[in-house]
């Protein structure tokens, strides 16, 4: 699998309280190059993923404010199985690592530099993985598609 040293942004994303891990099976992976705080940008893709019934991993520079609150509420209500982690690395190295994750999972990096806006993201831009395991310190992506 592909592993990096960033864990879940919020412990509310944990799926197994005993091991304090978040495990997502047959997941979509949204890879975003920027900070996500505006929930309006995130809602269109959340709704598309929710309709598939599959879980979603969000990898972004950060997820904060109302966007994070919305993810937590959806997770707690059972509307959407979701977890968010910060992107690994910094600066140009982060860009390379996000490209690597996109390559491993068959996804696209949502980057405004490249002309992709988060609010226009579609399911076809998302990566896929058989299994994602997240602890407070690290994320492992297994069986990228």
Curated annotation (Swiss-Prot):
Q: Where in the cell is it found?
A: Cytoplasm
The record's annotation in SUPFAM superfamilies points to: GroEL apical domain-like
This protein's UniProt keywords: ATP-binding, Chaperone, Cytoplasm, Isomerase, Nucleotide-binding
Molecular function GO terms recorded: ATP binding; ATP-dependent protein folding chaperone; isomerase activity
According to its UniProt record, the EC number is 5.6.1.7
GO CC annotations, alphabetized: cytoplasm
Keyword Oxidoreductase among record annotations: no
Q: Which reaction does it catalyse?
A: ATP + H2O + a folded polypeptide = ADP + phosphate + an unfolded polypeptide
Give the enzyme's main class according to its UniProt record, as a single word: isomerase
One annotated GO biological process: protein refolding
Chaperone among keywords: yes
Q: At the top level of its lineage, which domain of life is listed?
A: Bacteria
Q: Could you give the subunit structure recorded for this chain?
A: Forms a cylinder of 14 subunits composed of two heptameric rings stacked back-to-back. Interacts with the co-chaperonin GroES.
Family recorded in the similarity comment: Belongs to the chaperonin (HSP60) family.
Q: What does this protein do?
A: Together with its co-chaperonin GroES, plays an essential role in assisting protein folding. The GroEL-GroES system forms a nano-cage that allows encapsulation of the non-native substrate proteins and provides a physical environment optimized to promote and accelerate protein folding.
Q: Which PANTHER family match?
A: 60 KDA HEAT SHOCK PROTEIN, MITOCHONDRIAL
Q: What is this protein called?
A: Chaperonin GroEL
Organism name: Thermus thermophilus
